[in-house]
Design a protein with these regions (language model features):
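Alpha-helical ds-nucleic-acid-binding substructure associated with the helix-hairpin-helix region
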Residues: 74-150
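Short coil/turn segments at secondary-structure boundaries
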Residues: 64, 106, 121-127, 213-220
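Short helix-capping/linker segments at secondary-structure and domain boundaries
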Residues: 55-61, 115-123, 183-184, 223-224
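C-terminal accessory module of base-excision DNA glycosylases/AP lyases that mediates lesion recognition
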Residues: 1-29, 129-224
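Alpha-helix N-cap and coil->helix boundary residues
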Residues: 61-64, 83-84, 120, 169-173, ...
Length: 224
């Protein structure tokens, strides 16, 4: 794939944001594989759940309710959430501490099962995510989509970003930039486009070792 250099794209983004220093200050800090591996499984379930609840809803409301949500879901203990009874599910739908959306409440139980399964397979969710190769980030997204509940698309990508795993987020501005760079058409969910995004990010990252998360933000900030 013939791509414009990341340096050129970064220069455009820097011009739009007031200079290189201003741009650099807007780039996220990502965790190492060892740091990700050290994150307990309950914090992974908490972040997954938070991003599921935020999807299509006011993030400010979710943030305000989150301490109560943590308490209502037993501090997101995977084993406890997985064992949620029908009676407890019904009680949660009446609990004013949380956002009472039945499908999202049920996703906590289902994603607790995912967390426990990954922990059994890899030693912990953090070990699984931290060791996942960068050149197969789409494979990690596929895992969340296929084996998780409501973790396809934005929720899964945002959970990984917020917890510190390097990767991209297909925000509207980043998609616009990828289309402008000729990487893909507007349908970023197709298998063809996802493979093209992976190839482009791997190529750009190879130029100077730039993390995917930085490339993602640089692209998003390079367009009007």
């Amino acid at each position: 794939m013939t791509l414009r250099s990341l340096a050129d794209i970064r220069a455009r983004a820097a011009d739009r944001k007031g200079g290189e220093a201003a741009l650099a200050a807007l780039l996220p800090t990502m965790k190492t594989a060892a740091e990700l591996a050290a994150i307990p499984d309950d914090r992974w379930l908490s972040m997954m759940s938070r991003c599921v609840f935020q999807a299509g809803f006011s993030w400010k409301v979710v943030e305000t309710k989150w301490p109560g949500t943590e308490a209502a879901f037993w501090d997101f203990s995977p084993a406890r959430c997985r064992a949620m009874s029908d009676e407890e599910f019904d009680a949660l739908l009446k609990d004013s501490r949380i956002i009472r959306n039945g499908a999202k409440v049920r996703s906590v139980q289902n994603n607790a099962a995912l967390v426990m399964d990954l922990s059994a397979e890899y030693g912990s969710v953090g070990k699984a995510v931290g060791a996942w190769p960068a050149d197969d980030f789409i494979g990690l997204l596929d895992l969340l989509k296929k084996r998780g509940d409501r973790l396809g698309g934005g929720a899964g990508m945002m959970a990984l970003r917020f917890i510190g795993r390097d990767g991209w987020v297909t925000s509207p501005d980043m998609v616009k930039a990828l289309v402008a760079e000729g990487v893909m058409d507007g349908n970023h969910d197709s298998q063809k486009s996802r493979k093209a995004i992976q190839a482009a990010f791997s190529q750009w990252s190879a130029e100077h070792g730039t993390p995917f998360a930085h490339i993602s933000r640089i692209l998003a900030m390079s367009v009007d």
